[in-house]
Every structure is written in structure tokens, then in C-alpha cells.
């Protein structure tokens, strides 16, 4: 991490900026293959929380969750949300959201927030971390792979309606 980039915990004063970043992420993901279902099923609770008044407060109050912000030259340009999930006898870290504004990609902010989230998962005793990339989203897939992640599952989906992507 260079002096230009930093990672910090979100606070309730960041609610408006978190809402903006969440909305940007939703718009970007929503047009990708599998995006609409992903938004409804996998990220629905986090997105709804960040988009509603008081929602960030609820996420911040949950000790099994972490909301991080990445800054570049003092401006908030990234959001990462993770949670610890009990799986059998151990905990699994789950990255619910990791979004960096397009103008701030490739400068290290995404890696910085990811490293901070993985560091938190390690400290609280998680044995592994899961993150999601949509089919065809090579940028996200490459980002996670370059940071030590490996695919462990592919989810297949068959729409029963012609209108669903």
C-alpha cells in the first residue's frame, strides 16, 4: 500500500458514501450475465442494508461483519463487506461485496481492502475465505486469482422463463 491509498473501518458518518458505492456496484453487476439473480439472492441483504437509512448502522453493529472503505488520495473509492459464517466446527469468511470505482482500479486500493478483510478473517479464526465472480467477469476473476483465490465451485442456473438472464 502506498501513502496515496488507505483502508479504514466504515463509520455511521460514511452511510451516504456507502450508499453511493453500493448503487454503483449494483448498476455494474446488474447488466452482467447472472447479475440480476446474483443481486436478488447473494447480495440482497447487504445491498438492502446499505441502501436504506440506518442500514449501515445495522451492519456495523453485527460483530460477525466488517465494513471497510478504501481511500485514494483521501477520497473514498472502495467498499468491502465481509462476514464470518459458521460452517460445521469452524468459520468461513465470506466476502459479500468488494467494489472499487472504475477510475481507482489498478492502483492498489482493491488489493488493500481485500488484504484488510482477509486479515480480519484470519484474526477471528476463519479457516478459509469465499468470494464470488460472475461468469464472464474476467476482471473480477483475475483479481481474486492474483490474490491467492481458487475456484471451488461453479453454480449452474436454468431459467424457466425466457425473460430472465
Residue ranges and their predicted role:
Residues 90, 108, 139:
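Residues that form or flank phosphate/diphosphate-binding pockets in enzymes
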Amino acid at each position: 500500500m502506498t501513502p496515496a491509498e488507505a483502508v479504514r473501518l466504515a463509520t455511521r458518518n460514511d452511510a451516504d458514501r456507502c450508499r453511493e458505492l453500493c448503487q454503483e456496484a449494483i448498476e455494474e453487476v446488474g447488466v452482467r450475465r447472472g447479475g440480476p439473480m446474483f443481486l436478488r439472492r447473494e447480495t440482497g441483504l447487504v445491498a438492502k442494508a446499505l441502501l436504506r437509512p440506518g442500514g449501515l448502522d445495522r451492519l456495523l453493529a453485527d460483530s460477525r461483519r466488517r465494513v471497510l472503505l478504501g481511500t485514494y488520495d483521501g477520497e473514498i473509492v472502495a467498499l468491502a463487506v465481509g462476514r464470518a459464517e459458521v460452517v460445521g466446527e469452524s468459520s468461513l469468511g465470506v466476502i459479500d461485496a468488494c467494489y472499487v470505482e472504475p477510475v481507482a482500479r489498478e492502483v492498489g486500493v482493491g488489493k488493500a481492502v481485500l488484504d484488510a478483510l482477509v486479515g480480519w478473517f484470519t484474526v477471528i479464526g476463519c479457516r478459509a475465505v469465499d468470494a464470488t465472480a460472475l461468469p464472464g467477469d474476467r476482471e473480477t476473476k483475475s483479481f481474486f486469482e492474483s490474490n491467492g483465490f481458487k475456484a471451488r465451485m461453479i453454480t449452474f442456473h436454468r431459467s424457466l422463463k425466457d425473460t430472465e438472464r
